[in-house]
Structure formats: C-alpha cells, structure tokens
C-alpha cells in the first residue's frame, strides 16, 4: 500500500521556525522569514532563503511558501524507510490539505528512487504524486518527467502500491 507520506505524529507536533530576520503583519496574518530559514514540525524539515507563512483565522499556519536556490524539505514517511527529500526553486506547503507543490527543477527522492520534473504536486495524506514537464510557448508540456526506480525498491517508490 502507498501509505501516508508522514509519520502520524508529525501533524500534531508544534512548528518551529528560525531565521536571520522575521517580519510579521498582524492585519494580514503574514510572516516573512529571510536568511537561512529552517522550519521543523516532527520529522518534517524545510530549509530556504526566504519563507512566507500565512496564518488562518485561528492563528495557525495555513500556507508556507519557500523560495531559494533551491528550497529543500525532508520528511520521515515510514519508520522502516529513509526520509523523503525534495527540492525546487519554490515549495508551497498547505498545512491544512497536506499538499506540497514543488516548482522549478523539482526533485523528490527516497531510498534511491526519484522523480524529477518542472513541477511536482505531492499529497502527504493520499500518498500520490503528480509530475509535469516544462511548459512550452503554447502552454502544453514539452519537457519530460524523469523517474528512477531501483529494482530493490520498486514497490517502495513514493506513490507505488503493492
């Protein structure tokens, strides 16, 4: 089975944020972090040059947008597997839906398996991934998506099922 992409305890953990600089706008609920930003929640870790965090009406982080050259995240998805690691020029994490969008040279890998494309949409709750190549001038996808599945882990690739 595909399982979920996060340890069950991760979503119940507090979110820790550190950065060189932080600015908070109380009216908009938007906090901007810049300079060596690191966000951690349970086994999830997100690193970027800049992160913008949007708060919902309950004063909880709802959407995190990370940019950097590149922004990186990792998360332990299964105690028996290595961490899932991703990187892209921009990573948008929706804490309410559990969906991570990676765009710009997006890469996701775990235990030797990898998927690479211009954009990757990764649902931590459903355990599925949508990958797209680079759009051409007409808007259709002309770039290719690259997937590597080592023979020893063909059934453990993110999104694969038994």
Residue ranges of each PLM-predicted region?
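Mature-chain termini and adjacent capping regions
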Residues: 1-162
